[in-house]
Amino acid sequence: VSSGGPITQDNTGVEYYATLFAVDESPIQEGLIWVGSDDGLIHLTKDGGNTWENVTPKKMPEWMMINSIDASSFDTGTAYIAGTRYKLGDFTPYLYMTEDYGKNWKLITSGIESEHFTRVVRSDKVNKNILYAGTETGMYISFDKGNSWNKFQKNLPIVPITDLTIKDNSLIVATQGRSIWILDDLTVLHQLSQSTDEAKLYKPKDSYRMRGG
């Protein structure tokens, strides 16, 4: 078809496809850039865009919209992607991880409910095992690089999470229609393990008392 792919009921004009929807450069290797498109393709360049390689997961369903890409702050070959197919009637969550520059990908959605389709995934900047995922119906967290996920809703409203970012060790959450939320200071999360059977003391970040006058 002239649109380049399936026609949906979306009226934003994005179904002409071949449009880059997500871009992220490695924070630890200059010129290593990941891009994802609205027709389900992922490409990687290691030389600042001079040459590109198609590294799309072989088993990923076609016509996936790549909503977000997150390049690891620890390993140059590691990246995470979140994709959606809800416009095609598929509400399945799709999160993938690679640790070898896209040669092999692993689906990492265990623990996320079957119709909570995923809009964004971000990796922690301090603890390489912690991941955050935003779905159509709220937040999830993983303490084992995506092998398992737990709901992380707290006092967030049940609302689509459209983007996540970490700034000054705080998690900033963008929602669709319910403002921006901030989880201040991730220090305690960095000290959590997957599970614990005994009491544990957590070290908070340093605080300062200031005198006025």
Specify the residue positions occupied by each region the protein language model found:
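Beta-propeller blade termini and top-face loops
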Residues: 1-211
